[in-house]
Amino acid sequence: MATQPNQALPNGYRLNEYTIVRKIGGGGFSMVYLARDDNNQSVAIKEYLPGQLVLRTEGSVLVQASSTENNNIFRHGMKCFFEEGRALACIDHPNVIRVTNFFRANDTVYMVMRFERGKTLQQHIQANRGTIRESFIRRVFAQLMNGLREVHTHKLLHLDIKPSNLYIRLDGSPVLIDFGAARQTLSQEETKLQPMYTPGFAAPEQYHNRERLGPWTDIYSVGASLYASLAGYPPQAADARLLNDNLVPATVNWRGAYSDQLLETIDQCLKLNYMERPQSVFSLQKVLMDNTAMKPSRTSLLTSIKRSLSRELF
């Protein structure tokens, strides 16, 4: 029988107490579905489905490793994925994706999450390239730091912070989604797998020196996401920077357009030496919440000039 990698579960499929509506996302590590529970509430379900290791036989829902060697790696990754779901289920914070259930089925594992409506920061960046206000950046990232602080309090790391994993709800509040810790663990321990971090947003220690991972690793990714919010594209990848650092500092690129404080903070977060970065999310959050340092927008500056002229003329 023919096989296809990453064959999605069919629409309408009954998965435990959930009914699959449709596939809504996925990558090399997993698939994500919109589903409904028995109360007809929408949920998102992430299925552990690493395309490098497994195939789903056409017409079947079961997941099978593509070789005996891959089966051992797949089983180890499944354990990492399941443990990540268990850990995330302990976190109930408005700025962190809520994991409500996790279970085994179809010879793999699933993570059930609250379904959020809105768009990613990446979509916002693409729609407003070069025109994103500092007030928006500070508000979104300061709130996200609340969520990241909670994650770090639980002795967890995100390890895949980037604009496409920062979701902005319809009410404007942000939420951290799609944790990368299980992917990172698997790719570090199984060298035959392609790296599962995101170039440009991954810290240098994610490429090497895994023993040096810490809160500062996520802080590098926050800095890269801040940089991308201004530039519209990610900074130079950290492994390339280690060989030949061509990254133009934020303080050079956007001086005069954004506050010096914000630009200096971005550059500090993107230090290759992890000891030179902010060491805690709290210290970074304090800076982001300091709106007194914010540079007035061009619109507000023009408005103040017009008001001044009006007073002089009339």
Language-model regions, residue ranges each:
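Activation-segment/catalytic-loop signature of the eukaryotic protein kinase fold
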Residues: 102
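AlphaC helix of the eukaryotic protein kinase fold
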Residues: 57-90
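Conserved short submotifs of the Hanks-type protein kinase catalytic core
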Residues: 106-120, 124
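Activation segment signature within eukaryotic-like protein kinase domains
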Residues: 140-141
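Protein kinase catalytic-loop region centered on the HRD/HxD motif
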Residues: 144-156
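Conserved end of the kinase activation segment
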Residues: 205-216
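Conserved activation segment of eukaryotic-like protein kinases, specifically the C-terminal portion
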Residues: 191-205
